[in-house]
């Protein structure tokens, strides 16, 4: 992960992003993008810095900078980001992720989750129905999102979708590889289909119409909260439902995205459950629900995690 801090003489803003190898990103390449942007530059206007950040492509580097700018603006204006954007921080049902394994192991894993309302199940093209049947039998009161991670072919989708619907699957995420989505044109799926790897910014939406019914918004794909807000607004106007997704990161990485939860039909921001140590003022997850954002973590007029920022040594 990357943590970025942007400061003036009195205030600072911070944010976290997670470079993703699927998009040819790494901590090294993203850090180089950020350093190159600021090399031998000083700024006298916030707008000047914002314009420079927007010259970066959508991705993890821009995400960290954009969200740090929002946090800084909250401190400078003494107005929380939620207030600036007219958003409400809410408690939301959050999907818990179930990783690929044998049917028996996945069944045992979902049993240990204690009947969560929503489970995201990672499924490749092997044993699709056998795995899903074992999981559904162990959690008969749960609903499921199946994430194929681009691994299926159209025949896999066509042959399994009816059986998956009977197993309480309510959404299928990125069944086909990005770029092969044209096979979904005129396919009437009994389960809504969600674009993940095929959806990065609002510019992708016209292509996705007629292929998907839901778009997965991840700030590391959009390049920050600014574009995520635009994408969510335009997507809803075009008739798409919203899913909020994330990479594996701490609560700081989830914080900006959580402000869009009230617009989302599906929330999948469980990244902090997969890290060894979370932030001091972190989200809590209980009974399948994710707590509202604590503005003392990010996006508030004050930030009680200043002790962490003071320790950062930016090279």
From Swiss-Prot:
Record's catalysed reaction(s): N-acetyl-D-glutamate = N-acetyl-L-glutamate
EC number(s) recorded for this UniProt protein: 5.1.1.25
Class of the enzyme per the UniProt entry, highest EC level: isomerase
Superkingdom as given in the UniProt entry: Bacteria
Annotated binding of Mg(2+), by residue: 147, 173, 196
Induction: Expression is up-regulated in the presence of D-glutamate. Transcriptionally regulated by DgcR.
Family: Belongs to the mandelate racemase/muconate lactonizing enzyme family.
This protein's name: N-acetyl-D-glutamate racemase
Species of the source: Pseudoalteromonas sp
